[in-house]
Amino acid sequence: MQIKLENPLLLSKVVELISNLVIEVKFKIDSSGMSVIAIDPANVAMVRFFLAKNAFSQFDLEAKQEIWGVNLEDLKKILRRAGIKSSLILKREENRLNIEMSDKIKRNFTLNLIDIKSEDKEMPNLEFSAKVEINSADLIDAVEDCAVVADACSFVIENNNFIIEAKSLNSARSEFSGDEVNIQAENCKSKYSIEYLNKFVKGSKLCDKTILNFANDHPLRMDLNIENMELNFILAPRVESED
């Protein structure tokens, strides 16, 4: 099998994002495209990546499905060598992945494929009471503000306003009205780890808008949609026990 990307920089950025959560993943390649679904070692976060077949200039698949077990740290280092004008060809040869980059010169790398024993995963079918579409730059700023004062922040829907706030000895708060963000929600509140949110919102830099789905003390799903690509993160809530 052989697949080709004319611009591998987006793939490189996504691999770097996923590697912040998990190191070893299975790439699944089938007639629809390329996908990854993985859970971080702490079972707190989940990521799904899908790159549609239409994103590739060449997509020759001999079997119904190919599975590549990959160490993302190794793949990340190789993809960083791609330039702005590079094209990328991925070709499996037995237990290795041949990676060819072409621009002024043709460069070849080989990546050893690994056997990953974990079971195949599916994204859970979650129900949410809140859906917020927000400017990605505003989301990044709000999360970074909260990181200054605490290690967790709350996503709040209150009277059709969306609030991101953190409270400890100090506090931070960003409030967005329905005029600034697209809100489809009832009043609710849930708290999430800033350590993980900071990893997620790095992905928001890839697109202008980010979609947040959540509910009372409920997992968060963050959706990033770019042409021919989907990137989804799920984060468990931080539920504090009552004394």
Give a label for each model feature.
Residues 1-19, 26-148, 156-243:
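DNA polymerase sliding clamps and clamp-related checkpoint/processivity subunits
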